[in-house]
């Protein structure tokens, strides 16, 4: 039994060796290659995730930088406005003493010009105010004239309304009369036409009766003559037979 077992094991080993020789790759090598492939796939997956995260981070960083750049000009503009704001106020006091100095140097001529200019300004202000009362007076005069005209025209309008009311009444009366006359005339005409139409019908009927009688009278002699002729012919025929 032991000999058989040994022999069979040797045969199995020989078969495996032959397969390895044919393939050229050992099972250990296959397992190692598979493990390396799996590790490589994991590494590639991890690297891809890292790359995606880096891209997202880069995009977020770019957006943040853009926002910061946008905010920076706004802040600069605000600072510039704030910086420019006090400058006119600072310049005003500086110009004030200079103006005073120049006023002192020029002395009376400018003051005299101002004195001459004030009356002109006062007259100009009074001039536009002056036309206002005239316009008010004109408006009041127009309203008064309109009211007077309305009061003057009121009696004449009443007088015109009275004849206008009477005229429609007078116009209605003839219209009613003409309507009644128009309604009566057709009835009278129909009655006259019927009265005139009846006698001719009687005359026609009587003439027709007379014609019938005459026709009967005319036909009777003819019939009697025909009968006589027929009888004479019959007699002649009888005589011939006899």
UniProtKB/Swiss-Prot annotation:
Feature: compositional bias, Polar residues: 142-157
InterPro entries: IQ_motif_EF-hand-BS, Neuromodulin, Neuromodulin_C, Neuromodulin_gap-junction_N, Neuromodulin_P_site, Neuromodulin_palmitoyl_site
Residues bearing PTM Phosphothreonine: 185
Region (Disordered): 1-242
Post-translational modification: Phosphorylated. Phosphorylation of this protein by a protein kinase C is specifically correlated with certain forms of synaptic plasticity. Palmitoylated by ZDHHC3. Palmitoylation is regulated by ARF6 and is essential for plasma membrane association and axonal and dendritic filopodia induction. Deacylated by LYPLA2.
Membrane topology value: Peripheral membrane protein
CDD domains referenced in this protein's UniProt entry, alphabetically: IQCD
PANTHER family hit by this protein: NEUROMODULIN
Protein name: Neuromodulin
Organism: Felis catus (Cat)
